[in-house]
């Protein structure tokens, strides 16, 4: 099991660079986390494993205000139609890639998507000011998702340890011929 952050986007296509930029800043903050960059969301399916914790950062286009941040637990629910359904600058949209992974049984148990509302995807253009200004908040959302997943996994590990201890006690009582 590993923690994995994936930045989706193309740094040469305006606001589409935001996912990659968020991932790069997370790498600087959390050297213990594996950070990958892809221009096509479908590439992520081969990068993760079912027991991984994965946070994906990507540009979204839902008609909201540039720089708005959307956080979705994609392991628990489908990505909202309209935000990640179209391919944008990608051959395949993130929503389609996630649903393909779900259908193939390749969805990680913890998958959070952090999207930054984008508007301009032109070749050779910089990120819009509002999108660039949202990067620190998106980085914080990714870090929070990682911390929340770590806390949940620690709780599950403790519950597993408690279950083992209870099983050991029951076995010891059985060996003594008593009732648990």
Which residue ranges define each predicted feature?
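Glycine-rich phosphate/diphosphate-binding loops and the adjacent beta-loop-alpha structural elements
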Residues: 122
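Short "lid" loop at the C-terminus of a central beta-strand within the Rossmann-like core
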Residues: 119
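N-terminal catalytic or cofactor-binding beta/alpha core of small enzyme domains
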Residues: 1-116, 125-137, 144-179
């Amino acid at each position: 099991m590993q923690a994995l952050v994936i930045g989706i986007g193309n740094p040469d296509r305006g606001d589409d660079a935001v996912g990659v930029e968020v991932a790069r800043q997370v790498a600087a903050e959390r050297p213990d986390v594996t950070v990958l960059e892809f221009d096509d969301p479908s590439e992520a399916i081969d990068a993760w494993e079912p027991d991984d914790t994965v946070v994906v950062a990507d540009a979204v286009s839902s008609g909201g205000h540039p720089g708005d941040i959307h956080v979705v637990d994609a392991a628990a629910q489908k990505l909202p139609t309209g935000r990640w359904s179209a391919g944008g600058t990608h051959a395949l949209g993130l929503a389609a890639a996630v649903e393909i992974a779900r259908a193939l049984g390749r969805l990680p148990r913890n998958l959070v998507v952090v999207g930054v509302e984008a508007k301009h995807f032109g070749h050779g253009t910089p990120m819009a000011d509002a999108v660039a200004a949202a990067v620190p908040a998106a980085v914080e959302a990714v870090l929070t998702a990682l911390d929340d997943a770590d806390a949940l996994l620690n709780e599950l590990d403790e519950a597993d340890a408690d279950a083992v201890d209870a099983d050991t006690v029951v076995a010891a009582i059985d060996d003594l011929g008593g009732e648990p």
